Amino acid sequence: MAAAAAIAASKGNGGGGGRAGAGEASSSRRKKGPGPLTTAYLVIYNVVMTAGWLVIAVGLVRAYLAKGSYHSLYYSIEKPLKFFQTGALLEILHCAIGIVPSSVVLTSIQVMSRVFLIWAVTHSVKEVQSEDSVLLFVIAWTITEIIRYSFYTFSLLNHLPYLIKWARYTLFIVLYPMGVSGELLTIYAALPFVRQAGLYSISLPNKYNFSFDYYAFLILIMISYIPLFPQLYFHMIHQRRKILSHTEEHKKFE
């Protein structure tokens, strides 16, 4: 679910900040880029988000050096992680008002899936916060987002270093499975606590004649990874070949 955000690494088209590709040029969907004010805003947004995820990365390293252990590092970066991941909700607005030519639906799913994992699982089930699986997806997200927002920033400035482009379309090969593994293991670790506490579940009878089993809902989310992960992963592999091979061909003609 949250891992679906990684598809942003391969389906982007436009002006910076949108999860499905803010910052990448699109001749097919938008021949003109955003105006100067919009570009300035998107550059600022992406710079701030890059800096935010760098703060998270530095926080992880400092906590590890201070403790001498990678266990329970989540607590050292909990606040900035929640703040900057929740801040990505603005990317839905960017798509909705048209300053980024990406799908509102797709971007909403991608952003909300991560926000869900942060707030409805990791925040709500305190017992999982010390799990190593949380650190696994946090590290994967952190590296991914630093690269992604840097990519968008430089693209908006029309000065994209090849190294950043290469990293964006290459490191997902490791980071995507790493993030998926961390997400699934975290949800799995939360299941017994959710079931025991009846967290977010609604039982009958009630005046609305409606029931909801959050435990079963989390299981369905985990099952959804089975068809989604290989489909998205191999699509991204295909996109990598196409984009990087095009870059290499372009270099030959320069």
From Swiss-Prot:
One of its GO terms (biological process) is very long-chain fatty acid biosynthetic process. InterPro entries: Tyr_Pase-like_PTPLA (IPR007482). The active site is at Y176, E183. Pathway: Lipid metabolism; fatty acid biosynthesis. Glycans are attached at N209. It catalyses: a very-long-chain (3R)-3-hydroxyacyl-CoA = a very-long-chain (2E)-enoyl-CoA + H2O; (3R)-hydroxyhexadecanoyl-CoA = (2E)-hexadecenoyl-CoA + H2O; (3R)-hydroxyoctadecanoyl-CoA = (2E)-octadecenoyl-CoA + H2O; (3R)-hydroxyeicosanoyl-CoA = (2E)-eicosenoyl-CoA + H2O. Residues 61-79, 126-130, 188-217 are lumenal. Belongs to the very long-chain fatty acids dehydratase HACD family. This is Very-long-chain (3R)-3-hydroxyacyl-CoA dehydratase 2. It comes from Bos taurus (Bovine). The gene is HACD2.
